[in-house]
Amino acid sequence: MSTMSTMSTTTAPNIPTRALANGVEMPVLGYGVFQTPPEETERCVREALEVGYRLIDTAQSYANEEGVGAGLRDSGLDRQDVFLTTKVAPVNLTHDRAAASIDESLRLLGTDYIDLMLLHQPIADFPGAYRALEEAHREGKLRAIGVSNFYPDRLADIALLTEVPPMVNQVETHPFRQNAEAHELMTSLGVVHEAWAPFAEGKNGIFTNPVLSAIGEKHGKTAGQVTLRALIQQDVIVIPKSVRRTRMEENIDVFNFSLDEEDMAAFAALDDGSFPRIFDHRDPKMIAWLVSERVRKADPSGAALY
């Protein structure tokens, strides 16, 4: 297992951090704003920071980076006390578009640096886009860089052939798809595993799952809290999302208990291979939808990316 440190008292003392490959410290639990309406994002981010979150995860394609920046400013926290992640949208996955989009994200977020920038999808000219991340990293615009939704083959490819290997890979990870083998590869490559949809988007009865509920009853916690705690103990960074403050408070309250070997074995057994991926990046229909909806429609001229 990797070691985790605790953030300074000026940030969130109860949230441990993971050291990325270049030494940058990243909180092991953060707040995601996927599908949060732009008009609600500022409030949600401000409340999340008030609750104690110090990692905020957004993306260009979420169309709410500006709200994230406003929420951070409203919080009164110093910029260096909050870890900001955003992602290059599919429409920007060429070298030149990615480079320009990084500057636009900086403008919308209202900051002169981003803590972590990821390529959102392994499509289009992602190698060219990744070179833009490397350049921005060398220029000091990005403290750390990485990828999202890269399956093991693609991850190994980019990790072994780039000057600055990805430091993080954010992939679908939850009780029903824990990605144990992919996690081993990430660890061997020095890549930190981050989970999107740690609650499986509420599917498969996760919040009433009898195994998770039984573990929760043992520790006085909810099924959701057990899920987050188990993933963290598996060395996975988690970014749950909620627009309700009470749920934000519940999701962050996972550092005052630990799961034992029996609990972790029961949790691991939930991944029996029966739950389909929420989004399969090897399904041609999914990729066709992604390209048509997120790339072609974003460019009225219909110009090809490359």
Go through each PLM region and give its residues:
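N-terminal binding-site loop/beta-alpha segment at the start of enzyme catalytic domains
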Residues: 1-82, 199, 294-295, 299-306
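Alpha-helical scaffolding within the catalytic cores
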Residues: 11-18, 66-73, 102-104, 152-156, ...
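Acidic (Asp/Glu)-rich catalytic clusters
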Residues: 21, 69-81, 103-110, 135-137, ...
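Acidic-and-aromatic substrate-binding clefts and catalytic sites of carbohydrate-active enzymes
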Residues: 36-39, 58-67, 91-96, 122-127, ...
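Short, acidic/polar
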Residues: 36-49, 94-109, 128, 153-156, ...
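Residues at the N-termini of beta-strands
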Residues: 55, 113-116, 144, 168
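Glycine/small-residue-rich loop that forms an oxyanion/phosphate-binding "nest" at active or ligand-binding sites
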Residues: 87, 91-135
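Beta/alpha (TIM)-barrel catalytic core signal, keyed to glycine-rich beta->alpha loops juxtaposed to Asp/Glu
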Residues: 121-306
